[in-house]
């Protein structure tokens, strides 16, 4: 019996959302019970024995992964959302996109000062969204003790960007190219 790797469950869609882009679609991983289980287990493996107070997930696929990881750790989950999507008082961080700027927010009471947080998302590209999420968590007086991703796109430099911030970065697989 041949065992599939996490990478084998991820579909590539050519020219989406723009011509020349190879979109790494993790929804096929999420849809497969075995693949999804393998991914969650492997996201947790590097952190075995570590204590986390919260898991934070980046919108939107980071919510799916982060919720499952938080469940496995028996800890709380904190969504980091696009501006205007959270109902309570928030803090925000803006970051640069290829063409313009984006803003992410978190509730100002979602994480208590001094808590240890694991940041989770599906894909690490340039690292801009993850960096903004880390800054939000740090503004609340907390420590990001790890950043876990299913896919790393190393050609876009996100891992280097986060490691330059002193972050420990873990990805289950990498895809070269755009």
UniProtKB/Swiss-Prot annotation:
GO CC terms, sorted: cytoplasm
PANTHER family associated with the record: ADENINE PHOSPHORIBOSYLTRANSFERASE
Name by which UniProt lists this protein: Adenine phosphoribosyltransferase
InterPro entries reported in the protein's UniProt record: Ade_phspho_trans, PRibTrfase_dom, PRTase-like, UPRTase/APRTase
Keywords per UniProt: Cytoplasm, Glycosyltransferase, Purine salvage, Transferase
One GO term of the biological process aspect: AMP salvage
Family as reported in the entry's similarity comment: Belongs to the purine/pyrimidine phosphoribosyltransferase family.
Function: Catalyzes a salvage reaction resulting in the formation of AMP, that is energically less costly than de novo synthesis.
Pathway the protein takes part in: Purine metabolism; AMP biosynthesis via salvage pathway; AMP from adenine: step 1/1
Location of the protein in the cell: Cytoplasm
UniProt source species: Cereibacter sphaeroides (strain ATCC 17029 / ATH 2.4.9)
């Amino acid at each position: 019996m041949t065992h599939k790797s996490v990478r084998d469950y991820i579909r590539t869609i050519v020219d989406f959302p723009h011509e020349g882009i190879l979109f790494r679609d993790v929804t096929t991983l999420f849809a497969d019970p075995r693949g999804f289980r393998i991914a969650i287990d492997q996201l947790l493996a590097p952190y075995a024995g570590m204590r986390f107070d919260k898991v934070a997930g980046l919108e939107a696929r980071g919510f799916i992964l982060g919720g499952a990881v938080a469940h496995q750790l028996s800890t709380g989950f904190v969504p980091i959302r696009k501006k205007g999507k959270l109902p309570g008082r928030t803090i925000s961080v803006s970051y640069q996109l290829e063409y313009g700027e984006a803003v992410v927010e978190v509730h100002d009471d979602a994480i208590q000062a001094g808590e240890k947080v694991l940041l989770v998302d599906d894909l690490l590209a340039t690292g801009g969204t993850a960096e903004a999420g880390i800054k939000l968590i740090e503004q609340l007086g907390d420590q990001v003790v790890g950043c876990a991703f299913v896919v790393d796109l190393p050609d876009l430099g996100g891992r280097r960007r986060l490691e330059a911030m002193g972050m420990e970065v873990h990805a289950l697989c990498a895809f070269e190219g755009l």
